[in-house]
Amino acid sequence: VYDKGPWPRFYFTNKGKGGIRRKVYLDSVGGRIATNYWPYEETGHTDEAKKELIRIFGDAPFDTPKPTRLLRRVFDLSTNKDSTILDFFAGSGTTLHATMQLNAEDGGHRKCILVTNNENNICEEVTYERNKRVIQGYTTPKGEKVEGLHDNNLRYYRTNFLSRDKSV
């Protein structure tokens, strides 16, 4: 028994000699549809992501940040306003930054959980510090004041591994 809404619609390509494709209608996906071409003018690039870190920190303390605009685009397509987003490879904290920006933009209440192993103190020195500054506001190296995204909070939990003889 198929109980996940209306049956999906399919069509044949190349007059029946190609493949089968699924037809997606906007009303069935909440008016949002993903495309397979995302130009960097809309989603950013790594150079932009590094410049964003420089605006926040004065330098780029992380080698491979993701563009905030890219993650905002992903979340806009894949979440609703009350989703919980989980990132097990938190890196520089772009996921939380993008979540807070999108919430401010569309009035959402998305929650974001970041997890990292704190290799080279990245969580303490980059991930946490970045998002603390984004929430509280900061001054760029050029002296510009950036207003904080004050309607957010940030909690930091430290965990540890149990030795094998103590685990269940």
Labelled PLM ranges:
Residues V1-T84:
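Class I S-adenosyl-L-methionine
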Residues V1-Y2, P6-Y11, R110-K111, V115-N118, ...:
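Charged, often flexible domain-edge or linker segments that flank or initiate folded functional domains
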Residues G19-S28, Q101-L102, Q136-E147:
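Intrinsically disordered, low-complexity boundary segments flanking structured domains
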Residues Y37, C112-L114, Y156:
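Conserved beta-strand scaffold positions in the cores of enzyme catalytic domains, especially
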Residues E41-E42, T116, N160:
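Residues at the C-termini of beta-strands that transition into short coil/loop
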Residues E48-K51, E125, D165-V168:
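Short conserved micro-motifs at the rims of enzyme active sites and ligand-binding pockets
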Residues L71-T139:
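Conserved S-adenosyl-L-methionine
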Residues E129-V168:
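SAM-dependent methyltransferase catalytic region
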